[in-house]
């Protein structure tokens, strides 16, 4: 769950939302209220935090927080 906690912290900071709103099943746009610019900034912040690169083709598949956590965990293997 360490990855989730780190992702959650980035999401809370980038979207200026309450931490309680961020759950594994939360959809970034529909549930957390992100717009397309928010998503771009969120991806950039995640890349910086985790020292990874997320190609646009992968970024568009990251719909839920769970998708982001699993993606990052798979890169770290």
Swiss-Prot record:
Protein name listed in UniProt: Acyl carrier protein
KW Phosphoprotein (keyword) present: yes
Modified residues (O-(pantetheine 4'-phosphoryl)serine): 36
Primary localization: cytoplasm
Top-rank taxon: Bacteria
GO biological process terms held by the UniProt record: lipid A biosynthetic process
GO molecular-function term, one example from the UniProt record: acyl binding
Pathway of action: Lipid metabolism; fatty acid biosynthesis
Role this protein plays: Carrier of the growing fatty acid chain in fatty acid biosynthesis.
Subcellular location: Cytoplasm
Membership in a protein family: Belongs to the acyl carrier protein (ACP) family.
Keywords of the record: Cytoplasm, Fatty acid biosynthesis, Fatty acid metabolism, Lipid biosynthesis, Lipid metabolism, Phosphopantetheine, Phosphoprotein
Entry comment on modification after translation: 4'-phosphopantetheine is transferred from CoA to a specific serine of apo-ACP by AcpS. This modification is essential for activity because fatty acids are bound in thioester linkage to the sulfhydryl of the prosthetic group.
Keyword Lipid biosynthesis in annotation: yes
GO cellular component: cytosol; membrane
């Amino acid at each position: 769950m360490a990855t989730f906690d780190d992702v959650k912290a980035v999401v809370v900071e980038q979207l200026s939302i309450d931490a309680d709103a961020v759950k594994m099943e939360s959809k970034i746009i529909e549930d957390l209220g992100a717009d397309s610019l928010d998503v771009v900034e969120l991806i950039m912040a995640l890349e910086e935090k985790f020292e990874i690169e997320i190609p646009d083709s992968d970024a568009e598949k990251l719909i839920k927080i769970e998708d982001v956590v699993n993606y990052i965990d798979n890169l770290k293997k």
